[in-house]
Amino acid sequence: MRRVPLVRAAHFNGYLAVLRDLGVPIWGALRRAGLPATTEETPDLYLSLPRMMDFVAASGGARGAMELGFLAGQRATLEGLRPEFQCAILNAPSGFALLQAFLHHRKGEDTAAFSAVYPEGESLRVVCDQPGIEDSDALVCAEWMNLQAVVSIVRIVAGATWTP
């Protein structure tokens, strides 16, 4: 039996805020999608990642998954992470240690997440993948969230204006 990828509801809340700003009636849409209407009040609840991503893609209308993912990624904050993840990031002694903390703790936020860091010349390549939702129209939403997380972590060390 194939395992269902799960993600903490805290990471869904940014998408819900964007959709609400666009005028989407969230509660009814959540109910129709088989997702709990109490998602925003229960950030530690685990949700089906494919169902969540399908909901985002279906609810976004003309905006499209690409824009929704970007907008939700902009709303992501350190406070959305589990306390032990926050602590590991805030106490990391170096940029590489920050990336290692990200790799280690990411599975607690998203059970299907795959992350790795590979040396590439004098640089490092960070890989974030979402096995289990490759066929979803909303994969790009998860990719934006992952990109925002990595950029935010690098900016802790490289400065707020660093861009990939």
Regions from the PLM with identified roles:
Residues 114-164:
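DNA-contacting interfaces and partner/effector-binding or oligomerization modules
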